[in-house]
Amino acid sequence: MPHSFGAYLILYIMVDLFNYTRRASSVAHIGAIDLGGDNPIRIQSMTTTNTNDTEACVRQAEEIIKAGGELVRFTTQGSREAENMKNINAGIRADGYQTPLVADVHFNPNVADVAALYCEKVRVNPGNYVDPARKFIKQEYTDEEYAHELQKIEDRFVPFLNICKEHHTAIRIGVNHGSLSDRIRNRYGDTPEGIVESCLEFLRICKKENFHDVVISIKSSNTVVMVRSMRLLVEEMEKEGMNYPLHLGVTEAGEGEDGRIKSAVGIGALLADGIGDTVRVSLSEEPAAEIPVARHLVDYIGKKKGHLMIPATACPSFDWLRPTRRETVAVGNIGGNNVPVVISNRINGESTVCENKDATPDYIYIGGKMPKQFVPGQSYIVDYNVYETLNSKPETTGAKLYPIFPAMAMPLIASIKADVKFLTLQFGTPAEEYIACLKAHPEVVVICVSNHQNRLGDQRALVHEMMNAGLKNPVVFAEMYQHGKEEKSDFQLEAAADMGALMIDGLTDGIWLMNNGDIPAQTIDETAFGILQAARLRTSRTEYISCPGCGRTLYDLRETIAKIKEATKHLKGLKIGIMGCIVNGPGEMADAD
């Protein structure tokens, strides 16, 4: 009988939502390096050169290595390419590099057998290793027929494992959401359960054959599917006594700022919960450009290590595996069934006129200062002690003003009349006091802040405390950073990583990004909207699901992406798939329009 997910509620194992610790995994030996266990989180990339072009492959691989890549992957679509990995390996070793090389195999298990002779690791895709190419047809399998298909996989996979054992070659079981087999899709649907079962079918064979140099990946262009699937995989492996190391990545993330933000939302959400042993940030750019992005993301999350314990209690109704949006009462346009709002910080006298109409914040915080101009129809947040004064000025006519209170001013909330009020809270605020206040004032929106070393755990803690108290006030997460405009990419990666798990957990009714530096307010606002779109919570621009390219790509992918973007960037809300080959193309384009 195929594996069932029906008992997950009973066997459900919860990670520590509040205190960072890295998941304990087994160690995979991959050539000169070890992956998993107590080893550093490894950074890797993939070449885009023709694998039959030895010189070009060696050159690009060494660019990746010099940038800090610890593993380099090559596409091996046929036996000829797999055979040439011998020459590529020799060329790189002759230049003094011992970096492990990985062969990427699809559709043909015979190619994997050859690649295992010349590479330190071979990636196989369960969706097309033995199962026939997808035809997207409906076909019902009896349990006996299904078991027969599983036996076919084992009969072909075990000889490959034996070759790997003989040559000390590691493997990656790499499942892609876009290339699930028809067999899996027909039984489990296009779901995280199907994605995970596709992986487990191969892992059970590895375990049975005592083959332990295994790494696993589950990838999707949809960050929510990717994170939920990986969480479920961790849970299911735990049940079956497996703890293989995990490779993280958001496939077809795209390029530029959007690609970085989408990758950071998905990868960051998992790393922040201690999940992940190696990372590849898939960007439609030069492969070496992926390395510093992945490195910054890993190093940033690593700063959580050794933080002061957060003594919080998870809400019993919260489901980490299948989270739904926290139930809240709508306060104005915040919470309830509304999309998450964006609040912009303009306390330094900046103009509150927003030039990018697709990234116009829902609320602008101006503190206690008069801006150069109040925009009619725009909503402003002002400090509670100047709210009534500013609200009575003729300059504010046509604008909407709302007060914000620090925690110490809670007793004054009742004395000020407003349809929407904001209250800044951090975990550790005396619970009895703020809970009583919020119960008495359903018109209050909580601004959740944190200066804790592990701000994700700290902010989760406050919301879970509210949930345990039965509070339904909306919550906006406020995050402060310190970057100059030359560090814009770092700011975007950090903000997306911090917000990733909070959004996928269903806790987010709004986002307020702040920066103590000279990054323009418009850039910060655009980042906030980009993060919400990456988490599939709010669409504000055209979305491009574009792969990074590899040796299978037979055209100039980056030039094509640029042309498509220029022609379609005005089509707000449209998701456009741009694929370099057929491996994931049809499946990942199912997520596009």
Residue positions per predicted region:
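N-terminal amphipathic/basic-hydrophobic helices that include classical n-h-c signal peptides
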Residues: 1-13
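N-terminal amphipathic alpha-helix/helix-capping segment at the start of soluble metabolic enzymes
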Residues: 14-45, 161, 165, 303-351, ...
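Active-site beta->alpha loop and helix N-cap motifs at the rims of alpha/beta catalytic domains
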Residues: 16, 69-201, 344-457
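N-terminal glycine-rich anion-binding loops that anchor highly charged ligand groups
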Residues: 29-44, 49-68, 72, 77-80
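Short, acidic/polar
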Residues: 52-63, 108-112, 263-267, 350-356, ...
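A structural motif
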Residues: 66-71, 119, 211, 275-276, ...
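Catalytic alpha/beta core domains of metabolic enzymes, predominantly
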Residues: 140-153, 184-334, 418-420, 427-578
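C-terminal accessory/binding modules appended to enzymatic or scaffolding proteins
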Residues: 335-358, 556-593
